């Protein structure tokens, strides 16, 4: 049986869902916000339900992927009907920011999130976080045999033994962090090693399933896919464990899910309230107490008790505004991974 998260992952993208309404009418009346949502749908629905209950402001959302919706916003420019953009990863936020499409956030919203989880520009903010991990099959690898660094995976001894989903924005964000931290030459070499010796999978779930089934010894994914399956059926994670690279390794990259307000929005006050709520204690407790298993980023809100605390991950310092999605696409295409 496929897990609930597998079914969610299979839902067709780019559909418009309406909260508290029977039909979607774009950005609608003065109290209704339109969110372009690339974050997981179930989490955003929890945020919207809680926000509408507290404020009475109705919210609609258009579901899609990071790259898809980011490119759509850039194409729409000042004519976009969107009021808010939410993503799973930072590169799409950086692309929209570089296009000059974000409005400044209120200082009150910005101050709720520590500097390491938002860009210094104040054009958008982190709303959640997820960490890179190496999921490994416990029957194939001991802890002593695990790679010290994610960079080790391009070495000959790992050929054919690991995999990842290069077509997904999640993995591309990891490569963007690698590019920022190690430079173009090292990143290109690593991608060439992946092409020569890594197994290619459709997404994080398929990667984890392949590790669990013993198709590969290990795989690079985001942590919460493992925790979600562990909390449900353990169908695709029962034979696996997680390895955290730590030591400020590129493989310890913590990816920031972002939220920003579009300059073109005619409902900036309501949009500010929405982002202020998401990053408030009440909004972040949805992460702490829910089953998304993503990390809260607001000050004073701990992670779900099942997770390793963020401060213990020893993540490298990365500037989220400088995660270069276009350069990553170019490098991955040149390596034959896209």
Predicted regions and their residues:
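Extracytoplasmic "Venus flytrap"
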Residues: 29-47, 62
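C-terminal motif of bacterial Sec signal peptides marking the signal peptidase cleavage site
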Residues: 19-23
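Periplasmic-binding protein-like
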Residues: 130, 158-165, 191-194, 200-201, 236-263, 277-300
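A ligand-binding cleft/hinge motif common to bilobed small-molecule-binding domains
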Residues: 91-95, 218-239
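Extracytoplasmic ligand-binding site segments that recognize negatively charged/polar headgroups
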Residues: 38-45, 67-68, 74, 80-216, ...
């Amino acid at each position: 049986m496929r897990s609930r998260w597998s079914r969610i992952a299979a839902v067709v993208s780019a559909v418009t869902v309406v909260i508290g309404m029977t039909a979607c009418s774009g950005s609608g009346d003065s109290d209704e916000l339109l969110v372009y949502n690339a974050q997981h749908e179930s989490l955003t629905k929890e945020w919207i339900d809680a926000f509408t209950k507290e404020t009475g402001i109705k919210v609609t959302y258009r579901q899609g992927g990071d790259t898809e919706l980011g490119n759509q916003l850039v194409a729409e420019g000042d004519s976009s009907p969107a009021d808010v953009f939410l993503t799973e990863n930072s590169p799409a936020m950086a692309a929209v920011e570089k296009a000059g499409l974000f409005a400044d956030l209120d200082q009150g919203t910005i101050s709720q999130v520590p500097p390491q989880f938002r860009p210094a520009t104040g054009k958008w903010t982190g709303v959640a976080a997820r960490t890179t991990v190496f999921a490994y099959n416990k029957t194939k690898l001991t802890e002593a045999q695990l790679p010290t660094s994610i960079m080790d995976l391009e070495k000959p001894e790992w050929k054919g033994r690991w995999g990842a989903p290069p077509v997904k924005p999640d993995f591309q964000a990891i490569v963007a962090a690698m590019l920022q931290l190690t430079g173009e030459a090292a990143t290109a070499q690593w991608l060439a090693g992946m092409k020569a010796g890594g197994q290619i999978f459709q997404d994080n779930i398929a990667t984890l399933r392949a590790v669990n089934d013993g198709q590969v010894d290990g795989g690079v994914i985001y942590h919460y896919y493992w925790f979600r399956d562990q909390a449900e059926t353990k169908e695709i994670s029962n034979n696996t464990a997680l390895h955290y690279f730590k030591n400020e390794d590129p493989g310890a990259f913590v990816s920031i899910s972002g939220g920003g307000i579009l300059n073109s929005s005619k409902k900036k006050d309501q949009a500010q309230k929405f982002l202020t709520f998401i990053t408030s204690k009440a909004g972040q407790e949805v992460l702490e107490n829910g089953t998304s298993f993503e990390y809260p980023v607001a000050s004073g809100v701990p992670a779900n008790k099942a997770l390793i605390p963020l401060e213990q991950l020893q993540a490298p310092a990365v500037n989220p505004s400088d995660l270069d999605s276009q350069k990553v696409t170019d490098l991955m295409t040149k390596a034959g991974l896209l």
